[in-house]
Amino acid sequence: MAEVEERILRIKQHRGVIGLLIVDENGKVLRTTMNKQDKEQNPIQIAKKVTELAKKARSVVRDIDPQNDLTFFRVRGRNKQEIMVAPDKNLYLIVLQRTDFDEN
């Protein structure tokens, strides 16, 4: 468990990271660094939508090559945010990150 905590802390310390979610295959939030009461970036809604997208992306990868599997994907929106997803067999690691931070 300490190893998981260390990794979460390390990810959170990256520049621009808004939040991190660990989600099960049904979109249930198991762990988050985000405020569950946030109406604009509600982690429960993010988890549901991103797991749906990840399942579709995994299906596309497998349709193209049945021997292959989705290991990571990133989506960048116009709002200068990225959603990065690392799917595993039963879990998804989702990281939200701002991309508009100052480069200096």
List each language-model region with its residue ranges.
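Non-catalytic interaction/Regulatory regions outside core domains
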Residues: M1-N104
